[in-house]
UniProtKB/Swiss-Prot annotation:
Record's protein name: 3-isopropylmalate dehydratase large subunit
Purpose: Catalyzes the isomerization between 2-isopropylmalate and 3-isopropylmalate, via the formation of 2-isopropylmaleate.
Catalytic activity: (2R,3S)-3-isopropylmalate = (2S)-2-isopropylmalate
EC number: 4.2.1.33
Entry's cofactor comment: Binds 1 [4Fe-4S] cluster per subunit.
SUPFAM superfamilies given in the database record: Aconitase iron-sulfur domain
Organism: Campylobacter concisus (strain 13826)
Subunit structure: Heterodimer of LeuC and LeuD.
């Protein structure tokens, strides 16, 4: 039987050939929880009477949403995960001493391996498919079941193959490719499907761009996003202390897809997702014509808080100043990224431009803290969601864009095209 990469990964984990639509129970290689979702899983774990984790080395808790804690409620919530991690002597526990957003720090630490089946109690767990793994978000109760048994059930998803052709223009990145897909198919256009990204454009993308694309697969309703391993993937993995030996799977020629989409990127401009859906994509040229003044610009999150994003922003901000009526917040996705940015002089560039540089956190993205929007404020952001009230007041607006667009807009005080600078 001809199989997709997703079908092959599940076949490997189940021990028999499986195809899309089958209900299976699969071994889980890595379980991911955070300070918001893990306490619920811990409660269910303890309620079950379980005394130990099925696979302690395959469970990671990443404290990233409200860390350092912002108030008493978040402090007490974090305490639950901390005590559980210490009680079970978790090796893969990441807190203030080694901070990072979960979907950035796990690949950085070598905890995501090609061929894995990964689940996380966070919808953007699909990020890790960029490394040729099947990775998806689940609820906290599902997480608890996997903590106890080391397994979980799935319906093997059908796949949509997206083939990118052409050549990217300057300041067009992986973020723009995924926003363009979502613009074309809508927020439910890939419902419970595996979005498989391929083509000559993907072959030339950095890992950071690939992570951005897979991260936002869920915004099209997808169960996962996935990119087959190539030399760029292998180079990324080369110096990592990998948890286990990787397995490389590739879709067969003639494998069955729900649909195959071909996108020519030759004339693609940077894409801006207008409020209040990621599918509301428009060209940056349209946004410039709309003359949209901004109160806040944000660069960070599990979508675009990586080192390449900071380098892009620094190139644009160097020697410039953030507009007087605009705030620019920059949040490196991990401590390692922050330290690398500091060594390269990027942090100095940001501060001299008038930006605020924060510790790694999900805070602003989910409207938790460190960048909440007030009534009727407008923000251009590298994050992944722009729903009503996502980053603050329900009357505020979020425009999603790549790091270059956000940096250029911070200087202009309104949404700007970095190619015009």
């Amino acid at each position: 039987m001809k199989q997709t990469i997703t079908e092959k990964i599940f076949s490997d984990h189940v021990g028999k050939e499986v195809s899309a639509g089958e209900i299976i129970e699969s071994k889980i290689d890595m379980i991911i929880g955070n300070d918001i979702t893990t306490p619920i899983s811990i409660k269910q774990f303890e309620r079950s009477g379980a005394k130990k984790l099925a696979n302690p080395d395959g469970f990671a808790i990443v404290m990233d949403h409200y860390i350092p804690t912002k108030d008493i409620l978040s402090a007490n919530q974090a305490k639950i995960s901390r005590e559980f991690a210490y009680k079970h002597d978790l090796k893969n526990y990441f807190d203030e001493k080694d901070m990072g957003i979960e979907h950035a720090i796990l690949p950085e630490k070598g905890l995501v391996i090609p061929g894995d089946v990964i689940i996380g109690a966070d919808s953007h767990t699909c990020t890790h498919g960029a490394l040729g793994a099947f990775s998806t978000g689940m609820g906290s109760t599902d997480l608890a079941y996997a903590m106890i048994t080391g397994k979980n059930w799935f319906k093997v998803p059908e796949s949509i193959k997206v083939v990118f052709k052409g050549k990217l223009d300057k300041h067009v990145y992986g973020k723009d490719l995924i926003l363009e897909i979502i613009r074309q198919i809508g927020v439910d256009g890939a419902l419970y499907k595996a979005l498989e990204f391929s083509g000559e454009v993907i072959d030339g993308l950095s890992m950071d761009d690939r992570f951005s694309m897979c991260n936002m697969a869920i915004e099209a309703g997808a169960k996962s996003g996935i990119i087959a391993v190539d030399e760029i993937t292998k180079e990324f993995l080369k110096d990592k202390n990998l948890r286990d030996k990787p397995k490389f799977f590739y879709s067969d020629e003639g494998a069955k897809y729900d649909k195959i989409l071909e996108i020519d990127v030759t004339n693609l401009d940077p894409v801006i997702a207008y409020p209040f859906l990621p599918s509301n994509g428009k060209s940056v040229r349209q946004a410039v014509r709309d003359d949209l003044a901004i109160d806040q610009a944000f660069i960070g999150s599990c979508t675009n808080g990586r080192l390449s994003d900071l380098r892009i922003a620094a190139q644009i901000l160097k020697g410039k100043k953030v507009a007087r009526k605009t705030r620019l917040i920059i949040t490196p996705a991990t401590q390692k990224i922050a330290r690398a940015a500091e060594k390269e002089g990027l942090i100095d560039i940001f501060i001299e431009a008038g930006a605020v540089v924060s510790n790694p956190t999900c805070g602003a993205c989910l409207g938790g803290y460190m960048g909440i929007l007030g009534a009727n404020e407008r923000c251009i952001s590298t994050t992944n969601r722009n729903f009503v009230g996502r980053m603050g007041d329900r009357t505020s607006e979020i425009y999603l864009a790549n790091s270059a667009v956000v940096a250029a807009s911070a200087i202009a005080g309104k949404i700007a095209d970095p190619r015009d600078l």
